[in-house]
């Protein structure tokens, strides 16, 4: 099985760590992961039709376009795509309900 994943986080270190964790988890389940990364919501939305992303993992707090605003556009453009929000800030938990999404995960709990 192949899973096309879009990962967006404005922190390059977090982007790399999350990408590695996704690769590890997919490897454990024998899922081939094709991961595309962006460091801004604006960059992601410019390239949204370039790839057939099945799962987006979005940081919430980013400059210009937040992960929540990006998710609203993803919901319109690719309604079958699934979305997981990640954040270091619990204060954004209730904001994710403005969009269709699967989960909200705190970055500190990613490995669990």
Residue ranges and their predicted role:
Residues 1-6:
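Non-catalytic signal-transmission and effector/linker regions of two-component phosphorelay proteins
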Residues 7, 33, 45, 59:
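Generic anion/oxyanion-binding catalytic loop in active/binding sites
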Residues 8-9, 38-40, 56:
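Conserved sequence signature across two-component system core domains
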Residues 9-11, 88:
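Acidic di-acidic motifs
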Residues 12-36:
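Two-component/phosphorelay signaling modules centered on CheY-like receiver
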Residues 37-43, 67:
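Helix N-cap/capping motif at the beta->alpha junctions
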Residues 46-112:
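CheY-like receiver
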